[in-house]
């Protein structure tokens, strides 16, 4: 199966500047294509997983993935579909975040000097040295403000009478220049991104055409939500991070294990490397087979992101907890100061401190709704004092929020 054919078959396709021509070119030759990532955290989360899998698909078909870390543009902020102005990051934060993002990406793609090896660039390398007057002189005349004002991302802010600073308005010019720079210096002929980036991508392609006459393309992916409308990558407990220092492989496994029934087939297509035969089997699941399919999906996605050993450990932990009722040492763990437990802490405060509730009021609500357990026993009094007497084997306390969220408290 060719790159574009598989791209469409997996559900990645939304829009392309010239799909027929891009299909023909990628059949005849290998290209370089790039995707940009915000440099706003020390890890990517599953909201970026489709873009990462596209980079992986490019590499598998012999094309060269280029990853752009927005070290330069992160100093400004992308107004695209954002209701508020973004916080501007320091150089130190950007460098730290870039290191973590490369760690996320290295789980899925190979970086190096080979023809199809990925490279990662920070657009600060060329944007930081910009002279503003030179930029206006050399590139300003190629951009139409009339057209920029018609872009949905800008129009949305203006219609709501929300603040759109000149700083942010310049973001789309810089992203367009990124594409031009990569086309000129790395022979990059394709920019990929979410459908919310369409206007910025087209501006870059137009800039290249006007200056150099090169044939380049833009292609976007659909913006994904779960079947219930929730944003991919976010849960009530926070983001589903790819790096294990922010989210354990067990919690990563549990996220996919607990996905909605209606999402199984779509997630399998988007995020796994199951064969077509396996995908066909997912599409014809009987009701009694859904749980087994979720386990298989969670196992495969955890193996892809972390390792087969991590996937095995996550599966074994889940079996011990949910099927055998045991306590497993691989459960996520939080450490509580011994003095706190010796003095005693109320049940609702403990659930909040352990991260099983985002606020103390939410912890109270969890307990009042009979959703909280300590050492597998229902917590009936939110003010019950928890102390060292609750330690199992003098080591841990097991907290459970609902049937699927468990954590160990150690001192």
Swiss-Prot record:
Superkingdom, natural source: Bacteria
Gene name for this UniProt entry: tyrS
GO annotation, cellular component aspect: cytosol
Matching InterPro entries: aa-tRNA-synth_Ic, Rossmann-like_a/b/a_fold, S4_RNA-bd_sf, SYY-like_C, Tyr-tRNA-ligase, Tyr-tRNA-ligase_bac-type, Tyr-tRNA-ligase_bac_1
Organism: Rickettsia conorii (strain ATCC VR-613 / Malish 7)
Binding sites annotated in the UniProt record for ATP: 234
Protein's name in the database: Tyrosine--tRNA ligase
Compartment list: Cytoplasm
Disulfide bonds listed in the record: none
Oligomer and partners: Homodimer.
GO biological process: tyrosyl-tRNA aminoacylation
Motif annotated as 'HIGH' region, chain positions: 39-48
